[in-house]
């Protein structure tokens, strides 16, 4: 099914990133270094299972093929398995993924798969337990590693691992990461550090271009693969001697936004056209019952007329995004 969600730059949107909470129990230096602080979410709190069912139904009707559940830490919601099942009700949605810190992976991943989850991204910024603790504020490295093993045991053929690339922290550890994925079907995705409203100082200190790793991978014989239409923004590389893959997400690269295929809905029901963008379009008043789906679809489609051509990060724009937990990075 071709996506009906098309913007004025002829980009088609097949991929929804749906935040279901902004609460997180980790204190990652690049996201929530001081820990989670409630952002004043009052009124109805975070989206309910029924509201999630309605908003994903609308996106599915408009051609969305992939939904990623984000946060915060999605698995902190007690009804997380029910949320997966609610999204799974949409036959048009072929992929349901989660981005998680891995805290509850070992315990719950089999149940998530049974509910309909098809993909997992786990955040691991270092393979050194002490450095992992320093970055995340949690001494959970072994627990997260056990969770990744549990995901394979539960039947996931591949696990994606997200690593925020930081100068003088982990950028020099490529060989360690490559050894880890040589015999494991892990897609290791290095993500360039992005500047947010609260993270300007960290950005200036630790940002390094992913181009450095890209050049090194090509020098070592890694091969760039083609993207599918519902894939995320990573440039993916493979090598015949490795079971795993490497992905590079480089938002500061020229033309990064030209292939944008994803929209975001926050945990309080606002449609965000860009991670670094405007205040969002409220959808929640149309999620109260099943009778408003046509109006909901119309509002989503109309909002796309306002999507900008680029995120303007090159002009030092950080938008309203104070930290990445707010609308699910």
From Swiss-Prot:
Cite the GO molecular-function annotations of the record: 4 iron, 4 sulfur cluster binding; cyclic pyranopterin monophosphate synthase activity; GTP 3',8'-cyclase activity; GTP binding; metal ion binding; S-adenosyl-L-methionine binding
Q: Where is the Radical SAM core domain?
A: 8-234
| CC cofactor | [4Fe-4S] cluster
Keyword line: 4Fe-4S, GTP-binding, Iron, Iron-sulfur, Lyase, Metal-binding, Molybdenum cofactor biosynthesis, Nucleotide-binding, S-adenosyl-L-methionine
Q: Does the keyword Ion transport apply?
A: no
Listed name of the protein: GTP 3',8-cyclase
Cite the NCBIfam families for this sequence.
Answer: moaA
* SMART domains, per the entry: Elp3
Where does the source fall among the domains of life? Bacteria
UniProt subunit comment: Monomer and homodimer.
UniProt-listed CDD domains = Radical_SAM, Twitch_MoaA
Q: In which pathway does it act?
A: Cofactor biosynthesis; molybdopterin biosynthesis
- Co-factor remark: Binds 2 [4Fe-4S] clusters. Binds 1 [4Fe-4S] cluster coordinated with 3 cysteines and an exchangeable S-adenosyl-L-methionine and 1 [4Fe-4S] cluster coordinated with 3 cysteines and the GTP-derived substrate.
Classification via Pfam families: Fer4_12 (PF13353), Mob_synth_C (PF06463), Radical_SAM (PF04055)
Q: What is its EC number?
A: 4.1.99.22
Q: Which residues bind GTP?
A: 17, 68, 99, 160, 262-264
């Amino acid at each position: 099914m071709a996506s009906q969600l098309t913007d004025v730059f002829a980009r088609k949107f097949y991929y929804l990133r749906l935040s279901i909470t902004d609460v997180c129990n980790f204190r990652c230096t690049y996201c929530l270094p001081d820990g989670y602080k409630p952002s004043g979410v009052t009124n109805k709190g975070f989206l309910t299972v029924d509201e999630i069912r309605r908003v994903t139904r609308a996106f599915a009707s408009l051609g969305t093929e992939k939904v990623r559940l984000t946060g915060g830490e999605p698995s902190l919601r007690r009804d997380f398995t029910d949320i997966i099942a609610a999204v799974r009700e949409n036959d048009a949605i072929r992929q349901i993924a989660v981005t998680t810190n891995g805290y509850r992976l070992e315990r719950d991943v089999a149940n998530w798969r049974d509910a309909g989850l098809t993909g997992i991204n786990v955040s691991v910024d270092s393979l050194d337990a002490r450095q992992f603790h320093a970055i995340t504020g949690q001494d959970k490295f072994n627990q997260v590693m056990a969770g990744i093993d549990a995901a394979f045991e539960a039947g996931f053929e591949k696990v994606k691992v997200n690593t925020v690339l930081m100068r003088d922290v982990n950028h020099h550890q490529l060989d360690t990461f490559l050894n880890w994925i040589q015999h494991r079907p892990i897609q290791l995705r290095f993500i360039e550090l992005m500047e947010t409203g609260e993270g300007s100082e960290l950005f200036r200190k630790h940002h390094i271009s992913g181009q450095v790793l890209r050049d090194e991978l090509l020098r070592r014989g890694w091969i760039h693969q083609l993207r599918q239409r519902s894939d995320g923004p990573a440039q993916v590389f493979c090598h015949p001697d490795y079971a795993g893959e490497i992905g590079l997400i480089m938002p500061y690269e020229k033309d990064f936004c030209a292939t944008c295929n994803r929209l975001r809905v926050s945990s309080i029901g606002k449609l965000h056209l860009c991670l670094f963008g405007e205040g969002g379009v409220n959808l929640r008043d149309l999620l109260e019952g099943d009778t408003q789906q046509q109006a909901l679809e119309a509002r989503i489609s109309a909002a796309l007329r306002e999507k900008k051509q680029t995120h303007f990060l090159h002009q030092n724009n950080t938008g309203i995004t104070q930290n990445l937990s707010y609308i699910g990075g």
